[in-house]
């Protein structure tokens, strides 16, 4: 079978450190060809094109789509830079891998989802956590238990390192930009989310890193369609706390408390599954699954196709909308339909449209 011809739009941090290395073993095996890279930075194109052996490079995605024959394209852009990349790919029958968050505009994401569905192409949103072996273990355990409650804890340490991921109007805040990974993972465990209520806390001016313009603490409550209730807590105030951080999911079932982390699963305090830290192995597993689905022309092979993943997007954009409505309980159906919207251009919780 010929190599799958893949293009990349966006050569930022996640492409360079996760997706390109994740695909590299498939390139070396002859299963994948890096046909074309596209980025506005000619320096990035020259450096990464040489490092990963791209056959062609472009600064204009229109030209790339016009000149190259692609089987699939990775779209790894900040959410506010999504324009017509998915539309063009769908029109041409090209499979799409879209890094999260796929948009800050729910209406836009719904439109893209409809285009993908009409075209019948393979799609995947970059939720690699579903590909951890520990996630597989939890899914199996839950098939034999009755879950009642789930808790997500995401406590970040250190300073923000990228401009757009530190601006509320550019990334939607840490809950949208990063905690969405864990929100999607618990959806993998428990199914879709039905309702959301949230409260956020902002540091005052001068209390944190100057470049960070977004809420610093997020406290979100969910009700799942299956009846399970949950909470998700995210904190960005451990700026100078060394390595102090936490990233975990706790699922409380009848007579069973399951604790998930990247490399370990515990049940009632006992380790029941553990593996060595795999680094970015989940990205490689996700890449293998995506390429296999593209080769087979089978969208159902993916764990996070674009359409179903909109529930994860609605869950985090809905949290923002609830927080800016004093914690009002909102229906995710209303978020996805556009009846209730969050406007990323305004930071109502802080009283100003944007902070310079």
Where are these regions (language model features)?
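Beta-loop-alpha module in the N-terminal Rossmann-like domain of NAD(P)-dependent dehydrogenases
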Residues: 51-115
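Contiguous beta-strand/loop segments that form the cofactor/metal-binding neighborhood of enzyme cores
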Residues: 177, 183-264, 284-299, 317-320, ...
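N-terminal Rossmann-like dinucleotide-binding module
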Residues: 1-52
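Rossmann-fold dehydrogenase core element
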Residues: 111-128, 146-152
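Predominantly a Rossmann-like dinucleotide-binding segment in NAD(P)-dependent oxidoreductases
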Residues: 129-211
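Glycine-centered short loops/turns at secondary-structure junctions
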Residues: 93, 120, 227, 326-327
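Glycine- and charged-residue-rich phosphate/anionic-cofactor binding loop of Rossmann-like
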Residues: 32-35, 272-275, 293-312
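Hydrophobic residues in well-ordered beta-strands that form the structural core
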Residues: 98, 123-125, 151, 232, ...
